[in-house]
Curated annotation (Swiss-Prot):
Gene3D superfamilies: Winged helix-like DNA-binding domain superfamily/Winged helix DNA-binding domain. The keyword Acetylation applies. One of its GO terms (biological process) is nucleosome assembly. Belongs to the histone H1/H5 family. This is Histone H1. Residues 1-41, 89-218 are annotated as: Disordered. InterPro entries: H1/H5 (IPR005819), Histone_H1/H5_H15 (IPR005818), WH-like_DNA-bd_sf (IPR036388), WH_DNA-bd_sf (IPR036390). Residues 37-110 form the H15 domain. GO terms for molecular function: DNA binding; structural constituent of chromatin. Residues 1-19, 27-39 have a biased composition (Low complexity).
Length: 218
């Protein structure tokens, strides 16, 4: 009886090990099924824009219709479509003719290589400008100091000009001071004339005295 018991124990453990070995295989198969078999969003967008014959470009609404007709779920992947459009415009594969951001009309860039070359040419040209801008800034500070030195003689000239203005004003004051003297002389002359007119009045009483003396002789 003791020999049959240990033989049954290994028989039970063996199927458990086999089941554990089969589980990772199923998981591997599930991961393979999650990978998208169809083309990416950017590829679908480029195909739809290339198929359109509109001169002004394909609008966002027309692009969604074209993607929906191809079996793509537009409602669930709306954000992906917008991100795909922005990335394609940034790369230079698409050109935005109207609107801003993901909204508007889009066309295929016929010369994508030229846009990339222009972008690469502009970047190195911007780097040497930074050290060149610093040098004139230091040189510009020196002429400011020289300008401050030049301003000091201007201040010295201002008091000289003020002195000339005061000297010019002083004869006017002297002329004004001379005018009241003439006015003061004129009333003095008028006073001298008045006593002359009073003399004939004093002569009248003398004539009256002469008349009174005449009857005494009779």
């Amino acid at each position: 009886m003791s020999e049959t018991a240990p033989v049954a124990a290994p028989a039970v453990s063996a199927p458990g090990a086999k089941a554990a070995g089969k589980k990772p295989k199923k998981a591997a198969g599930g991961s393979k099924a999650r990978k998208p078999a169809g083309p990416s969003v950017t590829e679908l967008i480029t195909k739809a824009v290339a198929a359109s014959k509109e001169r002004k470009g394909l609008s966002l609404a027309a692009l969604k219709k074209a993607l929906a007709a191809g079996g793509y779920d537009v409602e669930k992947n709306n954000s992906r479509i917008k991100l795909g459009l922005k990335s394609l415009v940034g790369k230079g594969t698409l050109v935005q003719t109207k609107g801003t951001g993901a909204s508007g009309s889009f066309k295929l860039n016929k010369k994508p290589g030229e846009t990339k070359e222009k972008a690469t040419k502009k970047k190195p040209a911007a780097k040497p400008k930074k050290p060149a801008a610093k040098k004139p800034a230091s040189a510009a500070k020196k002429p400011k100091k020289a300008a401050a030195v030049k301003k000091s003689p201007k201040k010295a000239k201002k008091p000289a000009a003020a002195a000339t203005k005061k000297a010019a004003k002083s004869p006017k004051k002297a002329a004004k001071a001379g005018r009241p003297k003439k006015a003061a002389k004129s009333p003095a002359k008028a006073k001298a004339v008045k006593p002359k007119a009073a003399k004939p009045k004093a002569a009248k009483p003398k004539a009256a005295k002469a008349k009174k003396a005449a009857p005494k002789k009779k």
